[in-house]
Every structure is written in C-alpha cells, then in structure tokens.
Amino acid sequence: MTFTKQVVWDEVEMREVDVPAPVRRGRGLASSLRAELSGRGLARARDGVDEMTRGSAVVFGSSEGTHGNFLEVCYRRILAKPEWSRRLEKVHTARRQARPQGAAEQVRVWRELDAATSSDALLMNVFCYPRVWTQGLRALMGVSGGERIEFGVRSAASLERGLVNTTEIDMRIGDLLVEAKLTEADFQFGALRLVERYVDFDRVFDRERLEVTRLGLRSYQLVRGVLAAYAMDGRFCVFCDGRRVDLIEDWLRVM
C-alpha cells in the first residue's frame, strides 16, 4: 500500500505559486494558431514566388509544377483531376491587398487555397494523399474508402414554398459532409429567419436551445451543415485543430 504525504502550504508560499494563465477562447485561440502558421509559412516562403499580405500572412504560389501550400504528391494528384483542380481557382476574399512594386512586376490573383492558413488546403493535403485510406481512418469516418471524394460541393435542402437552398460543403465523401476549420474565429452568425425557412428545421432542432444574440444565430454554419446532411439522409462532421476548444464547445452546444 502506498501512502501520500499531505502537504499544507501557508499564505506566503501560496503567493509564490505560479498560476498558469487562463486558456484563451475564440479570437485569441484563432490568432495564436494563425501566428504559428504564418511563422511556419515565412520559414518556407520562396523569393519571387510567394507573397505576403499586409497582415504578415504568407500567400503561396505555384512554380514548375509545385505549390508552396501543398505536398508535391498531393498537388500532382489535384492537378490531374479536373474536379479537384477547380477548387484551386476560388479567389481569395481579400483578392490582393499588396500593390505591385514597379511597372514590371506581374500581379497574380490570390486564391483562397494559396493562404498558409487555409483549412481547405490542409483538407486537400490530407485526403488527396495516396493511400490515405488506412483501416483506422476508414473506421473513424465510417466509410469504405472507395467513395468519391468531392471538394467545394453544393448540397441542396428544401425550403418553404417549394424553394431549394444550396450550401457549400468543404468536402463530401459518400454520405458524409465535412466542414473544415483552422484559424476561422467561429462558425459565423446569421439571421435566424434564414434557417427557419428550411422545411426540416423544427424536426431537427429545438429552436429554444439555439443561441441567438444581437449578431444573429450563433454557429450559423453548423446549423446549415446539419440541415444539409439531414436533407440527403447523410452525416455531418467538423474537422478542426485540437487546440480550438472554442470550436469544439460550439459544436457541442449545437449538437
């Protein structure tokens, strides 16, 4: 039998104890992860190919069949599949913030998946990798591994008065819809009335338990993703960095 000696500290000793800082939530966690990814991107940036935003984030470019934001083997597979390579063309929401330095500089349009912080690029690096479908991953995701993998697809759901709404899904594998999050602050806010139009809304959700603030319905993307999956009799999941406990809490709050 093992005995543990009880230790009693006096008031002076307690004052000397280093108390760890509280875990930051929301934007603090997102900013910390964004800074880490930007630092890694800077270490890998190539002169004349990769660029910087005004916020010191790296925007990678392609050169000689390679791309700074993708593993070479994944990038080759993406370029070989038109249905995958189309995802690379989505224009970055910031387009281009930097101005050309001189008349001779060529200005390229920034794409969303060029950004070092792109969750979609990370998703494609994982699922476009050869022989990714190990037995463990198939079991984890509940797929056979032979399903078609689609990126940036539109999933339809029925609205009132016979209308149809489409939601962009980051990835679809068979009946599984996947939303990817990396450095995004949250799952966005949206008007409650927009999801109330879905014919399945009251069948799926207890509206009294959804959080509505002055900004609108919290975790709007999650609610729409679930409704899209329900409409196709499918499943819905979120992939995020394990340190994003704020996103995990949002998921649990909605589910």
Regions found by a protein language model. Name each.
Residues 175-176, 235:
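Structural motif
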Residues 136, 188, 248:
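Short acidic, gly/pro-rich beta-turn/loop elements at beta-sheet edges
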Residues 81-82, 107, 116, 120, ...:
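Electrostatic, structured charged patches in enzyme active sites and in nucleic-acid/phosphate-binding
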Residues 236-255:
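C-terminal/domain-terminus segments
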